[in-house]
Amino acid sequence: MAHKKGTGSTRNGRDSRAQRLGVKRYGGQTVTTGSILVRQRGTKVHPGNNVGRGGDDTLFALVDGIVKFEHYKRGRRKVSVYPADASA
């Protein structure tokens, strides 16, 4: 039997929490005002109609409605929210 406890590595064994980025509400989903649509770093997706952009580039809905992802300007993407009654 060992009379001394084995020494473990004290410098490893940690990792930082992932950032949980990405699309949170997809095209066709119904959202309420203030709902987060996309969490991102930089503008991979640009804000469209009725969508605001936070200080950390998070996109959020400014009105209740239905989410729609659209292409515009040479390969760029934007996300818009259209009121539910207008899309019917």
Curated annotation (Swiss-Prot):
Similarity field: Belongs to the bacterial ribosomal protein bL27 family.
Organism: Picosynechococcus sp. (strain ATCC 27264 / PCC 7002 / PR-6)
InterPro entries given in the database record: Ribosomal_bL27, Ribosomal_bL27_CS
The name this protein goes by in its record: Large ribosomal subunit protein bL27
MF term (GO), any: structural constituent of ribosome
GO biological process: translation
GO cellular component: cytosolic large ribosomal subunit
Keyword Ribonucleoprotein: yes
Keywords: Ribonucleoprotein, Ribosomal protein
KW Cell membrane (keyword) present: no
Cited SUPFAM superfamilies: Ribosomal L27 protein-like
UniProt-annotated stretches for the region Disordered: 1-21
A Pfam cross-reference name: Ribosomal_L27
